């Protein structure tokens, strides 16, 4: 079971003080455990792509408009294009959270579409809605906008805004997006039990810095 879960894990390192040696270790672990991807900040994409060139099943994932989601659609589109040029094959973008709360749904939709269009045919797009900052109504609206924009996944959290994934949020997101969109649980998934709870609730991908601990049946005390 833990081995099949490994293939659902985005092995994640997004800390601002990340070093090159840590990225090398992250990629080595991803190859050893057959994780779905490594998820790194944009500055590390080219290195990760180089390190994983002999492991085509391990994707290179990066983050866009991260962690606040407060850049413009044009900037997010440029970030996406640049990341893909550097070797990213998956992008996790943060929505404009304030615009969602203001019910500026057209702006939020345009924000997501800018990244989807920039990534089209080249990279999967995952939409981070930052569940810990949203009401249930806002979570539903964000998921609906992601579906409408043509995203591939919805994702719970950045790991930088306090709360992380909950099984309740995953179940709600799965209900809204239906069976055909991916749902990624991220933030606070620290052991195999946490991961199984998210998968049982409807998650198809797990974002975690604790990937090795998860597949080894241990527990990690990280924030992501």
Curated annotation (Swiss-Prot):
GO BP annotations, alphabetical order: 2-deoxyribose 1-phosphate catabolic process; carbohydrate catabolic process; deoxyribonucleotide catabolic process
Keyword Cytoplasm among UniProt keywords: yes
UniProt entry keywords in alphabetical sequence: Cytoplasm, Lyase, Schiff base
EC number: 4.1.2.4
Pathway(s) the chain acts in: Carbohydrate degradation; 2-deoxy-D-ribose 1-phosphate degradation; D-glyceraldehyde 3-phosphate and acetaldehyde from 2-deoxy-alpha-D-ribose 1-phosphate: step 2/2
Superkingdom field: Bacteria
Descriptive protein name: Deoxyribose-phosphate aldolase
Species of provenance: Halalkalibacterium halodurans (strain ATCC BAA-125 / DSM 18197 / FERM 7344 / JCM 9153 / C-125) (Bacillus halodurans)
Gene name for this UniProt entry: deoC
């Amino acid at each position: 079971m833990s081995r099949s879960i490994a293939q659902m894990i985005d092995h994640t390192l997004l800390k601002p003080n990340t070093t090159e040696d840590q990225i090398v270790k992250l990629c080595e672990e991803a190859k050893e455990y057959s994780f779905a991807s490594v998820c790194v900040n944009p500055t590390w994409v080219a290195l990760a792509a180089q390190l994983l060139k002999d492991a085509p099943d391990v994707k290179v994932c990066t983050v866009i408009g991260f962690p606040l989601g407060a850049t413009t659609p044009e900037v997010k589109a440029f970030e996406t294009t640049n990341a893909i040029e550097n070797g990213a094959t998956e992008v996790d973008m943060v929505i404009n959270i304030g615009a969602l709360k203001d019910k500026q749904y057209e702006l939020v939709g345009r924000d997501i579409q800018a990244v989807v269009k920039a990534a089209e045919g080249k990279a999967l797009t995952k939409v981070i809605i930052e569940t810990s900052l949203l009401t249930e109504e806002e979570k539903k609206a964000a998921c609906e906008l992601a579906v409408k924009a043509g995203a591939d996944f919805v994702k719970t959290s950045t790991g930088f805004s306090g709360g992380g994934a909950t099984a309740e949020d995953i179940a709600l997101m799965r209900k809204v997006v239906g069976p055909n969109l991916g749902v990624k649980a991220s933030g606070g998934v620290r052991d195999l039990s946490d991961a199984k709870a998210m998968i049982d609730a409807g998650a198809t991908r797990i974002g975690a810095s604790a990937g090795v601990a998860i597949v080894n049946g241990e527990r990690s005390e990280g924030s992501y």
